[in-house]
């Protein structure tokens, strides 16, 4: 039996099984990106940032299906099945490349998007509205204060109306004596939220892009394996694939 065919069939069978696990992994990654975005959506004006995540989840659903198709086609040595398997892999490969490109594009646009929206959200802080809850969540979760730093609060109406203090969410954890006075910097988180949120979103997108790239490489070898089996079968149709 041709070693190329044996190797290719083995790769395809493993690839088909991996597709199920990969589908679950991609679904998790896509959901993680969307969840991370939703946690801070008040500070993001461009919802197109979610395009890579949407593509990832769509690919995950399809991968569950083609994992089954791939197993059946490889075991039964069906040329039609293998051809269909190859087409689907190529489509998924193209979708993953597209998601990767979108990830690169929107990774470079995060800072500009944050700069446009964060100042507006912080200026609307009044202690009661939805922007207030978003800012408090951001500052407490990321341990930051203000857009660039804690002094940004001096430009807000909140600061003037509350005895020149910043919100309690600017206080360091477990600092019960913190009153929000800028004269007590040791009790406050002094790093700006824009830089921290940008880093969080950059890390999330980078993680997603690495996963996409890894699975795209697997798909590439899968396409090569299908081509090897198909070509060898045409040349040796009289010879069974298994002895």
UniProtKB/Swiss-Prot annotation:
One of its GO terms (biological process) is pigmentation. InterPro entries: Tetraspanin/Peripherin, Tetraspanin_animals, Tetraspanin_EC2_sf. The chain crosses the membrane at residues 10-30, 50-70, 85-105, 209-229. It comes from the Eukaryota. Residues 31-49, 106-208 are lumenal. Glycans are attached at residues 149, 163, 174. N-glycosylated. Keywords: Developmental protein, Endoplasmic reticulum, Glycoprotein, Golgi apparatus, Membrane, Transmembrane, Transmembrane helix. It is a multi-pass membrane protein. Its main location: Golgi. Gene3D superfamilies: Tetraspanin. Strongly expressed in melanophores and xanthophores. Also detected in eye, brain, heart, skin, fin, testis and ovary. Residues 1-9, 71-84, 230-243 are cytoplasmic. It is found in: Golgi apparatus membrane; Endoplasmic reticulum membrane. One of its GO terms (cellular component) is Golgi membrane. Plays a role in migration and segregation of pigment cells (melanophores and xanthophores). Contributes to pigment stripe patterning in the epidermis. Belongs to the tetraspanin (TM4SF) family. PANTHER family: TETRASPANIN, TETRASPANIN-36. This is Tetraspanin-36. The gene is tspan36.
């Amino acid at each position: 039996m041709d070693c190329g065919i044996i190797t290719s069939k083995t790769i395809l069978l493993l690839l088909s099984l991996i597709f199920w696990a990969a589908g679950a992994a991609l679904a998790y990654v896509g959901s993680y990106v969307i969840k991370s975005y939703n946690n801070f959506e008040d500070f993001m004006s461009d919802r197109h940032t979610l395009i890579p995540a949407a593509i990832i989840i769509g690919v995950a659903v399809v991968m569950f299906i083609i994992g089954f198709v791939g197993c059946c086609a490889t075991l039964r040595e069906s040329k039609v099945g293998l051809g269909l398997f190859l087409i689907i892999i190529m489509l998924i490969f193209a979708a993953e490349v597209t998601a990767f490109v979108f990830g690169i594009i929107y990774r470079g646009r995060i800072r500009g998007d944050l700069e446009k929206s964060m100042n507006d959200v912080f200026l609307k802080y009044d202690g009661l509205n939805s922007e207030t809850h978003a800012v408090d969540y951001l500052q407490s979760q990321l341990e930051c204060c203000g857009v660039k730093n804690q002094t940004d609060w001096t430009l807000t109406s909140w600061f003037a109306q509350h005895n020149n203090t910043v919100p309690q969410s600017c206080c360091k954890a477990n600092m019960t004596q913190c009153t929000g006075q800028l004269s007590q910097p040791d009790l406050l988180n002094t790093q700006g939220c824009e830089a921290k949120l940008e880093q969080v979103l950059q890390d999330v997108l980078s993680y997603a892009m690495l996963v996409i790239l890894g699975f795209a490489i697997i798909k590439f070898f899968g396409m090569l394996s299908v081509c090897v089996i198909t070509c060898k079968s045409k040349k040796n149709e009289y010879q069974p694939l298994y002895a």
